[in-house]
Amino acid sequence: MGVLRLLVLCTLAACCVARSPPAPPLPNAPFAPLRPLGCNDSEVLAVAGFALQNINRVQKDGYMLTLNRVHDARVHRQEDMGSLFYLMLDVLETGCHVLSRKALKDCGPRIFYETVHGQCKAMFHVNKPRRVLYLPAYNCTLRPVSKRKIHSMCPDCPHPVDLSAPSVLEAATESLAKFNSENPSKQYALVKVTKATTQWVVGPSYFVEYLIKESPCTQSQDSCSLQASDSEPVGLCQGSLIKSPGVPPQRFKKTVTVSCEFFESQDQVPGGENPADTQDAKKLPQKNTAPTSSPSITAPRGSIQHLPEQEEPEDSKGKSPEEPFPVQLDLTTNPQGDTLDVSFLYLEPEEKKLVVLPFPGKEQRSPECPGPEKQRTP
């Protein structure tokens, strides 16, 4: 009986081994987490510089941005695809218009009472062996320094004024008229005012910056500066209109100054091509059949948002402070990541895809972040 029972148990064990289904496969391991980097590391500062260079390059309007400090930096190393950096950058507006295409090293930040500052979030792809530098996405938010802060530091300094104010337009048109009268060989028309401040000197004074374009009209036409044409802006002018008491006292004497800087001619429309530094975009094959999870793009996705000055309410004690520079940048919300087709950067038959993760928050930031400021903002 015991032998029979042992025989039955052995038979059952053999059947279970033979017919047991294979063990379920292990779930795929999640993508490697983002690694925090020091905000003053040489690699991080170099990548931040490339990112801002690309952001400036694709703009068609406004002023170039310069780096004040790296606020946060993470990296995702991706085997043969190189690295994808996630950067949060504190930036300052310079006095160089984006159409000037000047080297960023030649563009300093504005004087403190004209300060415009903010933050950019950027993703930047680096593949050193393949000599690829690429900006897939960015977003920036900028604000001017508040009038209250300017007044507390320098009560008599110029302060910003509405660009559409009649006195601002008067300063722009009269200073441009002066420039045209002193340069009769070619006439220029006003495109738009880009900056304006006011100050009381010996009377009301206005200081303006504005874009100009070539005008088909002649010097004898008084409305030349307001005539429309399809030509692109060719330069940036700085003008001033200072009014001082005249004779009789009810009238003002006007003093007008102007200087204009002309842009170098561009062979291509700014921002119209692929900003990858090491690639000729006109020769790059572009795919348009990629699935939604891996869109094929050449120009970076992003924008620069200008917000009004932020005033601190008098009864703000005990309240949570408002986020000064709200910036969102998410190519995906999938915590496991999605893929981004960057095959056009590599010119190879097989597809090349980057893994893109949600933009990181403040958690697990490097203790070396934020980095040191280059210029203290008011």
From Swiss-Prot:
Its main location: secreted. Residues 28-141, 152-261 form the Cystatin fetuin-B-type domain. The keyword Signal applies. Residues 1-18 form the signal peptide. InterPro entries: Cystatin_dom, Cystatin_Fetuin_B, Cystatin_sf, Kininogen_Fetuin_HRG, Prot_inh_fetuin_CS. This is Fetuin-B. One of its GO terms (cellular component) is extracellular space. The gene is Fetub.
